[in-house]
């Protein structure tokens, strides 16, 4: 049994936050938070006229009084100068690095006069813009253009770089391709009659001749690659236990298994009802089907503990909470679906429900591995087409039935044939299960069913052969009825001699009398 956990009571501040907005706070909570109690009022009104500052009255430990405080001594320790942190790399100077002194190019003579006289330039400067004189110089085209020839001294050969006077023009070619995922061309096809959806058609004519273009080709042995429809059947491999193992997930699964399979704290119940896989709520209580509700979540069932309610399944008695499904692996290697439930068997006065934890589980059956079979290609694809022209399917013969020549036949027949004899159809038509309709299209018609008449079965007459063969006619056969003997004595022995008792008590059930010894 799981030990009940004690619920912590809410503090005064939490109660005040929840009830202040609705105005339902108790008076003691409201006065304590707003500092309006009797003690707060005494301190508030009493501090107006009375001052207790020098008496050392306080809630903490105080030395108190005029002689209790120690005066400050004159010696005060002065801290040292803080250390300046210097950068390890010398920063670069921002701005111009070279400083040019004033008049460093043309120094002033110290004996020169300090007053500089103005010099008249003669003509006044024209401050307005004017047209500038432009001289066009045309150079004649040289007749002979000299070519620079590099001269190499020594015993080496000269390498001349010849440059074309008219270099070729360079072009940039780009190509853009748009893929259409809804259109797919299959290069291989099977002879299936249908509509051709390819845009490329190749016509090969026989006897038209040919021409070989290019040099003599080299014969290369080609290999046969498998088509897109060929496949290989893989051999059956043992089923894999896990995919990518992760240490953290493995640790969480170990903790989960430790919580589910702890027999001291958790009750183990195996469920065989198939509703546990889809709708486990139907095993806890009787209810209607709700197609919108999702069963793959944690479900809480509110009920009164005082009321006795019998669940559909006895194993789910007093279930208050049923967890979400968990998929684990059993010891036999099968998939196990588990749900952790909580019973509410006892309810205290404070509203706390006490109950044990229950682990409901069911094991899924093993799926046997079937032998793989080779599948055949079915259906039509783009490119599988045989186009048939309609004029080639039928033949039209135009003739007059009245002008028919004489037909030669081996049997002696009449030489005169008319159109009615040629159109005569000797086929036997059947009108079984047909309807005969009387009336016109203007009014409602009446339908009459023609019954199907069948000829009776022919009577078979057996004639006895006199040449020695014997005909055996079927006849009724009577088998003797076997009567099994009944037991003469009944299986239960009933004593009817003694009529003083209405029941029979076995001697072993009678009380033994204690024998007393007489002195």
UniProtKB/Swiss-Prot annotation:
InterPro entries: Late_L2
Motif Nuclear localization signal boundaries: 1-10, 511-518
N-terminal signal peptide: none
GO CC aspect terms: host cell; host cell endosome; host cell Golgi apparatus; host cell nucleus; viral capsid
Protein location: Virion; Host nucleus; Host early endosome; Host Golgi apparatus
Post-translational modification: Highly phosphorylated.
Gene Ontology MF terms: DNA binding; structural molecule activity
GO annotation, biological process: microtubule-dependent intracellular transport of viral material towards nucleus; symbiont entry into host cell; viral penetration into host nucleus
Keyword Phosphoprotein: yes
Disulfide bonds, paired cysteine numbers: 19-25
Keyword Cell inner membrane: no
Function: Minor protein of the capsid that localizes along the inner surface of the virion, within the central cavities beneath the L1 pentamers. Plays a role in capsid stabilization through interaction with the major capsid protein L1. Once the virion enters the host cell, L2 escorts the genomic DNA into the nucleus by promoting escape from the endosomal compartments and traffic through the host Golgi network.
HAMAP family: PPV_L2 (MF_04003)
Known partners and oligomeric status: Interacts with major capsid protein L1. Interacts with E2; this interaction inhibits E2 transcriptional activity but not the DNA replication function E2. Interacts with host GADD45GIP1. Interacts with host HSPA8; this interaction is required for L2 nuclear translocation. Interacts with host importins KPNB2 and KPNB3. Forms a complex with importin alpha2-beta1 heterodimers via interaction with the importin alpha2 adapter. Interacts with host DYNLT1; this interaction is essential for virus intracellular transport during entry.
Family statement drawn from the similarity comment of this UniProt entry: Belongs to the papillomaviridae L2 protein family.
Protein name per its UniProtKB record: Minor capsid protein L2
Species in which this protein is naturally found: Human papillomavirus 23
Upper lineage: Viruses, Monodnaviria, Shotokuvirae, Cossaviricota, Papovaviricetes
């Amino acid at each position: 049994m799981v030990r009940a956990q004690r619920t912590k009571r809410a503090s005064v501040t939490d109660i005040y936050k929840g009830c202040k907005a609705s105005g339902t706070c108790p008076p003691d909570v409201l006065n304590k938070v707003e500092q309006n109690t009797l003690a707060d009022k005494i301190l508030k009104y009493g501090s107006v006229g009375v001052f207790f500052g020098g008496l050392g009255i306080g809630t903490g430990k105080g030395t108190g009084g005029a002689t209790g405080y120690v005066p400050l001594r004159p010696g005060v320790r002065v801290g040292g100068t803080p250390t300046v942190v210097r950068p390890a790399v010398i920063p670069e100077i921002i701005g111009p690095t070279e400083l040019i002194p004033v008049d460093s190019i043309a120094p002033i003579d110290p004996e020169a006069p300090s007053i500089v006289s103005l010099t008249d330039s003669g003509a006044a400067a024209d401050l307005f813009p004017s047209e500038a004189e432009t001289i066009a110089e045309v150079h004649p085209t040289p007749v002979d253009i000299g070519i620079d020839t590099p001269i190499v001294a020594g015993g080496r050969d000269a390498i001349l770089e010849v440059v074309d006077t008219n270099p070729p023009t360079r072009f940039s070619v780009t190509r853009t391709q748009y893929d259409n995922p809804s259109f797919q061309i299959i290069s291989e096809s099977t002879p299936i009659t249908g509509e051709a959806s390819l845009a490329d058609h190749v016509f090969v004519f026989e006897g038209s001749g040919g021409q070989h273009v290019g040099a003599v080709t080299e014969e290369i042995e080609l290999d046969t690659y498998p088509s897109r429809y060929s496949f290989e059947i893989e051999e059956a491999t043992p089923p894999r236990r896990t995919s990518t193992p992760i240490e953290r997930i493995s640790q969480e699964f170990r903790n989960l298994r430790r919580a589910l399979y702890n027999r001291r704290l958790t009750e183990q119940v195996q469920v065989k009802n198939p509703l546990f896989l889809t709708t486990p709520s139907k095993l806890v209580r009787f209810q209607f089907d709700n197609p919108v509700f999702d069963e793959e979540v944690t479900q809480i069932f509110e009920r009164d503990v005082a009321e006795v309610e019998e669940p559909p399944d006895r194993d789910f008695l007093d279930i208050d909470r049923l967890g979400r499904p968990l998929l684990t692996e059993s010891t036999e290697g099968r998939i196990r679906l588990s749900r952790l439930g909580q019973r509410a068997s006892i309810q205290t006065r404070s509203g706390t429900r006490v109950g044990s934890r229950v682990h409901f589980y069911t094991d899924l059956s093993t799926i046997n591995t079937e032998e793989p079979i080779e599948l055949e290609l079915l259906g039509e694809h783009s490119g599988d087409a045989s186009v048939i022209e309609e004029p080639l399917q039928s033949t039209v013969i135009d003739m007059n039935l009245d002008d028919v020549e004489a037909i030669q036949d081996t049997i002696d027949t009449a030489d005169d044939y008319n159109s009615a004899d040629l159109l005569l159809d000797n086929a036997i038509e059947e009108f079984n299960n047909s309807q005969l309709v009387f009336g016109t299209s203007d009014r409602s018609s009446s339908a009459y069913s023609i019954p199907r008449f069948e000829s009776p079965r022919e009577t078979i007459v057996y004639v006895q052969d006199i040449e020695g063969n014997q005909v055996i006619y079927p006849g009724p056969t009577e088998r003797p009825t076997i009567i099994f003997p009944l037991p003469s004595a009944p299986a239960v022995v009933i004593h009817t001699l003694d009529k003083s008792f209405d029941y029979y008590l076995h001697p072993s059930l009678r009380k033994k009398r204690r024998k007393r010894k007489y002195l």
